[in-house]
From Swiss-Prot:
Its main location: plastid. It is found in: Plastid, Chloroplast. GO terms for cellular component: chloroplast; mitochondrial large ribosomal subunit. This is Large ribosomal subunit protein uL2cz/uL2cy. Residues 1-22, 225-273 are annotated as: Disordered. InterPro entries: NA-bd_OB-fold, Rib_uL2_dom2, Ribosomal_uL2, Ribosomal_uL2_bac/org-type, Ribosomal_uL2_C, Ribosomal_uL2_CS, Ribosomal_uL2_dom3, Ribosomal_uL2_RNA-bd_dom. One of its GO terms (biological process) is mitochondrial translation. SMART domains: Ribosomal_L2, Ribosomal_L2_C. The gene is rpl2-A. One of its GO terms (molecular function) is transferase activity.
């Protein structure tokens, strides 16, 4: 993609880049308002998720995760910015007049043609069942349950790999390093999600992060003892414990939060790293 490089002495825009091909003009029939209530609070108004609040107003774009336009080719018309996710989205015009948004596959440009269904070519942006894909295929937007829509590998730069097929199940290596089983009847999209370098983007200032709805993160060691187990002491004091803890006293940095008995444990062959 063509990129525009800012050359200014201002820290907020210094060395910043903008994709010239990426626009932000959503279609009216594919967007709707979404009331963001609470912003980290529960029904009683108590903070349950810290560091959330503020943020610019957003319109939700309806993304086609199911890809159920079978055997109808579509053309990429625009590549757009979506404020609700870190991946770009692209507008597809199908041959029957239908218009939908999908996640932008890496390398896809305006004018490319995509299609979904069985026995379709193994090319970037096409969606087909895992049973029709060869081993080693890079995929994203993977279904867990047939017909429910893609739920795995949807973030910017995410890509999974099909490593084995046996019986009715396929073995996938997910971006987290987890190896799990998925039904071969589930759909997946060929390729990698675009906007790969989003994690290397420099926001430049605190205000840019506030626009994203993220509030400042304060270290526990600079708090008072009443607010955090790491707090207190004279001057620049250590945490005073053998291991770091959360604000509620539980072990931090490596504590597993997944439920011990979950229905999907039998489908996970290797835990994530």
């Amino acid at each position: 993609m063509a990129k525009h490089l800012y050359k200014t002495p201002i820290p907020s825009t210094r060395k910043g880049t903008v994709d010239r091909q990426v626009k932000s003009n959503p279609r009216n029939k594919l967007i709707h308002g979404r009331h963001r209530c609470g912003k980290g609070r529960n029904a009683r108004g108590i903070i349950t998720a810290r560091h959330r609040g503020g943020g610019h107003k957003r319109l939700y774009r309806k993304i086609d995760f199911r890809r159920n336009q079978k055997d109808i080719s579509g053309r990429i018309v625009t590549i757009e910015y979506d404020p609700n996710r870190n991946a770009y989205i692209c507008l597809i015009h199908y041959g029957d007049g239908e218009k939908r948004y999908i996640l932008h596959p890496r390398g896809a440009i305006i004018g490319d043609t995509i299609v979904s269904g069985t026995k379709v070519p193994i090319s970037m942006g096409n969606a087909l069942p895992l049973t029709d894909m060869p081993l080693g295929t890079a995929i994203h937007n993977i279904e867990i349950t047939r017909g429910r829509g893609g739920q795995l590998a949807r973030a910017a730069g995410a890509v999974a790999k099909l490593i084995a097929k046996e019986g009715k199940l396929a073995t996938l290596r997910l971006p987290s390093g987890e190896v799990r089983l998925v039904s071969q009847n589930c759909l997946a999209t060929v390729g990698q999600v675009g906007n790969v370098g989003v994690n290397q983007k420099s926001l430049g200032r605190a205000g840019s992060k506030c626009w994203l709805g993220k509030r400042p993160v304060v270290r526990g060691v600079v708090m008072n003892p009443v607010d955090h187990p790491h707090g207190g002491g004279e001057g620049k004091a250590p945490i005073g414990r053998k291991k770091p803890t959360t604000p509620w006293g539980y072990p931090a940095l490596g504590r597993r939060t997944r439920k011990r008995k979950k229905y999907s444990d039998s489908f996970i062959l290797r835990r994530r790293k």
